[in-house]
From Swiss-Prot:
Protein name per Swiss-Prot or TrEMBL: Transcription factor bHLH157
GO BP terms: cellular response to auxin stimulus; male meiotic nuclear division; meiotic cell cycle; metaxylem development; root development; seed development; xylem development
PANTHER family according to UniProt: TRANSCRIPTION FACTOR BHLH155-LIKE ISOFORM X1-RELATED, TRANSCRIPTION FACTOR BHLH157
Entry GO MF terms: DNA binding; DNA-binding transcription factor activity; protein dimerization activity
Motif Nuclear localization signal, residue numbers: 341-348
Family stated for the protein in its record: Belongs to the bHLH protein family. LHW subfamily.
Subcellular localization(s) per the UniProt record: Nucleus
Length: 527
């Protein structure tokens, strides 16, 4: 945004002959203060703009503050300076001493309000007459930039694109079924090319009659029964089983790809027993007599499966059989083919079925440790309970830096400090007092440690302590210590601050005087 403001200010200066342009914007912390946002200037006005950087006009005070408060622009010329002389004298403590020096060579100064965005100040070494075109162009350019949305979608474009969409009636999709949408053009088959041609007619007939045994099995089994089929079985006497289907067999239904004979599967279980039986006997006699305990298949379903004819061993080609057998069948299982199958080491153990949403696999140790550390951080960092992990880490870094600064400044505050000002009767004042009985309401002192200042100010009410703190923070000062003290029936705000090298004691005093005058006028109006 800074480059956009500078580009607009530059175009205003070049198009209308202004020597400099300064954009004053409302401070986000204290809306009563205007802060320096961006500027453009020529070589002659470099010093003027540099002096404006550290100024902070207050709303309703001074020319810039009055323009921001009233919303009416001001157009000043050097030949009418005598009309404003008294006001400039009053504005000396308000931070506008720079305007007096401007008129030594500046002919025109224009201060234009921008509504809620702020104020723009223009100056020129030439006499530029007031123009409605300049006012409208300046206001429109800067307000559009301030109110421009960032990273927001264009809703009009979105609705236009939605309006171009064509709506299709639901009847046009009635010809599609679930299997038609997700079926492959050429699904893999376990049958050899010779058997595909010979079985095409019978397969089509079975498809017409609806005798798809693979889907009969899935429809007759419940979800719990399917889990039991996939789990390791107890003592059973299983023989081989192959179910005749139309281009689908039990392995296709369960997602096993016959084109990958080296697929690694669990060495023990129902399907390994079935495959070992079919490989050893070279026959595929269909039988579900010993598997019926796993499911609630009714008598008609079992009868249909029992009467289904078996194919020869060509269902599993010989070259694929050797590879598959070595991977799927262990030595101890080969010896148990055709007999009673038992598990010696897991005979009396029953597996518990996993509940919905739970996983049997244990969480990795490193992931568990990370989750534990994040939980501890959320309890330690303020406002870290409901934020994301990225925000939590950012808050953690800021909190650590803050705690480190507390330890650093705590040691410094324990050390005795002295003011750099000249002591007189054990008291130091930020400005001269005519007589000893007068108490100055504001004191700003520079301490013996570089960059540190002590600020003291009278508070009429306790709520003014927070306002003073906001003004101090608005000047870019870091508050190291802030307390309220009672002295002779008056409440004093006492601050020790860390200032940047470019901030002077006089500038801090100017801002506090403005705040003090604002409260004084407010009290006079109430009284």
């Amino acid at each position: 945004m800074g480059s956009e403001y500078k580009h607009i200010l530059k175009s205003l200066c070049l198009s209308h002959g202004w020597s400099y342009a300064v954009f004053w914007r409302y401070d986000p912390i204290n809306s009563m203060i205007l802060r320096f946002e961006e500027a453009y200037n020529d070589e002659q006005s470099v010093a003027l703009v540099d002096d404006m950087v550290l100024q902070a006009p207050i709303l309703g005070q001074g020319i810039v503050g009055e323009v921001a408060s009233s919303g009416n622009h001001q157009w000043l010329f050097s030949d009418t300076l005598f009309q404003w002389e008294h006001e400039f004298q009053n504005q000396f403590l308000c931070g506008f001493k720079i305007l007096i020096r401007q008129f030594t060579y500046t002919q025109t100064i224009a201060i234009i309000p921008l509504g809620s965005s702020g104020v723009v100040q223009l100056g020129s070494t030439q006499k530029i007459l007031e123009s409605t075109e300049i006012l409208e162009q300046t206001t429109r350019a800067l307000q559009e930039t301030c109110l421009k949305p960032h990273d927001s979608g264009d809703l009009d474009t979105l609705f236009e694109s939605l309006g171009d969409c064509e709506i299709f009636p639901a009847e046009s999709f009635q010809g599609f079924s679930f299997d038609d949408i997700f079926a492959e053009d050429n699904p893999p088959s376990l049958l050899s090319p010779e058997m595909i041609s010979s079985e095409a007619a019978s397969s089509n007939q079975d498809l017409t009659n609806g005798d798809d045994y693979g889907f009969d099995i899935l429809q007759s089994y419940s979800l719990d029964d399917l889990y039991q089929l996939l789990a390791d079985p107890p003592e059973q006497n299983c023989s081989s089983m192959v179910i005749q289907g139309v281009d689908k067999d039990l392995f296709d239904i369960l997602g096993m790809n016959s084109q990958t004979p080296t697929m690694a599967l669990p060495p023990k279980g129902l399907f390994s027993e079935l495959i070992s039986s079919s490989l050893s006997n070279n026959t595929c006699s269909s039988s579900l007599t010993n598997v019926q305990e796993y499911s609630g298949v009714n008598q008609s379903k079992r009868r249909k499966l029992d009467t289904s004819s078996a194919h020869s061993s060509s269902l599993f080609p010989q070259e694929e059989t050797v590879t598959s057998r070595s991977l799927w069948i262990d030595d101890d299982e080969r010896s148990s083919i055709g007999g009673n199958w038992k598990k010696p080491h897991e005979e009396g153990v029953k597996k518990k079925r996993a509940k919905a949403g739970e996983s049997r696999r244990p969480r990795p140790k490193d992931r568990q440790m990370i989750q534990d550390r994040i939980k501890e951080l959320r309890g330690m960092i303020p406002n870290g309970a409901k934020c994301s992990i990225d925000t939590l880490l950012d808050l953690t870094i800021k909190h650590m830096v803050f705690m480190q600064s507390l330890a650093k400044y705590a040691e410094r505050l324990k050390q005795p400090y002295e003011s750099k000002l000249v002591k007189e009767k054990e008291r130091t004042w930020a400005l001269e007092v005519g007589e000893e009985g007068v108490v100055c309401p504001i004191m700003v002192e520079e301490l013996n440690r570089e960059g540190e200042m002590q600020i003291e100010m009278v508070c009429e009410e306790r709520e003014e302590f927070l306002e003073i703190g906001q003004v101090v923070r608005g000047l870019g000062l870091k508050i190291l210590k802030g307390v309220m003290e009672t002295r002779k029936g008056q409440i004093w705000a006492h601050f020790i601050v860390q200032a940047k090298p470019q901030v002077t004691r006089i500038q801090v005093l100017y801002s506090l005087v403005q705040l003090f005058q604002h409260h004084t006028k407010h009290d006079d109006l109430l009284s």
